[in-house]
Protein backbone atom coordinates (compact mmCIF):
# COMPACT_ATOMS: atom_id res chain seq x y z
CA UNK A 1 0.00 0.00 0.00
CA UNK A 2 1.34 3.44 -0.91
CA UNK A 3 1.82 6.05 1.78
CA UNK A 4 1.57 9.64 0.55
CA UNK A 5 2.08 12.93 2.38
CA UNK A 6 2.62 16.50 1.20
CA UNK A 7 5.79 18.15 2.51
CA UNK A 8 7.18 21.66 2.19
CA UNK A 9 10.72 22.46 1.05
CA UNK A 10 12.54 24.49 3.71
CA UNK A 11 14.78 27.51 3.26
CA UNK A 12 17.83 25.23 2.87
CA UNK A 13 16.03 23.03 0.29
CA UNK A 14 15.40 20.32 2.89
CA UNK A 15 12.28 18.22 3.35
CA UNK A 16 11.18 16.28 6.40
CA UNK A 17 10.14 12.67 5.87
CA UNK A 18 6.66 12.51 7.40
CA UNK A 19 6.17 10.45 10.58
CA UNK A 20 3.78 8.00 8.84
CA UNK A 21 6.45 7.20 6.26
CA UNK A 22 9.29 7.01 8.82
CA UNK A 23 7.27 4.63 10.97
CA UNK A 24 6.05 2.42 8.12
CA UNK A 25 9.56 1.97 6.71
CA UNK A 26 11.38 2.16 10.07
CA UNK A 27 13.58 5.05 8.93
CA UNK A 28 15.90 6.29 11.67
CA UNK A 29 18.23 9.25 12.07
CA UNK A 30 21.49 8.51 10.27
CA UNK A 31 19.93 6.14 7.70
CA UNK A 32 21.02 6.63 4.11
CA UNK A 33 18.53 7.39 1.35
CA UNK A 34 19.02 7.74 -2.39
CA UNK A 35 17.07 10.53 -4.13
CA UNK A 36 16.31 10.10 -7.83
CA UNK A 37 14.52 12.58 -10.11
CA UNK A 38 12.78 11.17 -13.18
CA UNK A 39 12.64 14.07 -15.64
CA UNK A 40 10.19 12.34 -17.97
CA UNK A 41 7.49 12.08 -15.31
CA UNK A 42 8.56 14.82 -12.91
CA UNK A 43 8.80 12.24 -10.12
CA UNK A 44 11.21 12.32 -7.18
CA UNK A 45 11.86 8.89 -5.70
CA UNK A 46 13.44 8.31 -2.29
CA UNK A 47 14.93 4.87 -1.71
CA UNK A 48 16.05 3.66 1.71
CA UNK A 49 19.53 2.14 1.44
CA UNK A 50 21.13 -0.56 3.54
CA UNK A 51 23.87 1.53 5.14
CA UNK A 52 26.21 -1.48 5.36
CA UNK A 53 26.12 -2.40 1.68
CA UNK A 54 24.90 0.64 -0.27
CA UNK A 55 27.07 3.43 1.15
CA UNK A 56 28.90 4.00 -2.15
Curated annotation (Swiss-Prot):
The keyword DNA-binding applies. This is Repressor-like protein SSo7c4. It comes from the Archaea. Residues 4-51 form the SpoVT-AbrB domain. InterPro entries: Repressor-like_regulatory (IPR052975), SpoVT-AbrB_dom (IPR007159), SpoVT-AbrB_sf (IPR037914). PROSITE patterns: SPOVT_ABRB. It holds the Pfam family MazE_antitoxin. The keyword DNA-binding applies. Keywords: DNA-binding. It comes from Saccharolobus solfataricus (strain ATCC 35092 / DSM 1617 / JCM 11322 / P2). Signal peptide: none annotated. GO terms for molecular function: DNA binding.
